């Protein structure tokens, strides 16, 4: 009789546990940022110490790039981003958000920017903006239209030509 009670209690606990896990899995709303959504605004300091926000780029297309100095693909695409910034400065804003909490120091980020002669803003992310944008891999690039709406999300390296195509600049 005791064995039947224990088996019944175990069965009820197992069914309850399974039900709870299913509820937790399927009741969650989809998280992350998607194409067609307004890009969340943020404000971060630049390497030069000034405050910069995504709102500063309103009215221009935006190439919002999340990167790190230790990321080889990030290093490969930086020259293309710099060329784009110079060629299309009147209608494009390149915004590079550095994953600063994973860097050895801001000096390392500054040395990187100097090595590549980068003139676009390098934002120092100590607030976890990369997590807000659901960045799981570097580089990750968000393409925004002039109103700040996400048009494309690209994970991995892009060539200048690919950037121009995604930004509809060519």
Swiss-Prot record:
Recorded topology in the membrane: Single-pass membrane protein
Subcellular localization(s) per the UniProt record: Cell membrane
Disulfide pattern: 71-74
Transmembrane segments annotated in the record for this chain: 5-23
Keyword Transmembrane helix annotated: yes
GO MF terms, alphabetically ordered: antioxidant activity; oxidoreductase activity
Name of encoding gene: yneN
Organism field: Bacillus subtilis (strain 168)
High-level lineage: Bacteria, Bacillati, Bacillota, Bacilli, Bacillales
Record's keyword annotation contains Transmembrane helix: yes
Residue intervals of the Thioredoxin domain: 33-170
GO CC, one annotated term: plasma membrane
Alphabetical keyword list: Cell membrane, Disulfide bond, Membrane, Redox-active center, Transmembrane, Transmembrane helix
Protein's name in the database: Thioredoxin-like protein YneN
Observed phenotype of the null mutant: No sporulation-related phenotype.
Broad class of the protein's primary localization: membrane
One Pfam family matching this protein: AhpC-TSA
Family: Belongs to the thioredoxin family.
Top-rank lineage group of the source organism: Bacteria
């Amino acid at each position: 009789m005791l064995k039947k009670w224990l088996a019944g209690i175990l069965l009820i606990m197992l069914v309850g546990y399974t039900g709870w896990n299913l509820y937790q899995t399927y009741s969650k709303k989809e998280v992350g940022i998607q194409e067609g959504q307004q890009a969340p605004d943020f404000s971060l300091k630049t390497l030069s110490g000034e405050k910069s926000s995504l709102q500063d780029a309103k009215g221009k297309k935006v190439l919002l790039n999340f990167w790190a100095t230790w990321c080889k693909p990030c290093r490969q695409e930086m020259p293309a981003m710099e060329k784009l910034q110079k060629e299309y400065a009147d209608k494009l804003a390149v915004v590079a958000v550095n994953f600063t909490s994973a860097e050895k120091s801001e000096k390392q980020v500054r040395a990187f920017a100097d090595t590549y002669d980068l003139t676009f803003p390098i934002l120092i992310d100590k607030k976890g903006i990369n997590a807000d944008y659901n960045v799981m891999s570097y580089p990750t690039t968000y393409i925004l239209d002039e109103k700040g709406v996400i048009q494309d999300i690209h994970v991995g390296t892009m060539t200048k030509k690919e950037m121009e195509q995604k930004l509809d600049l060519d």
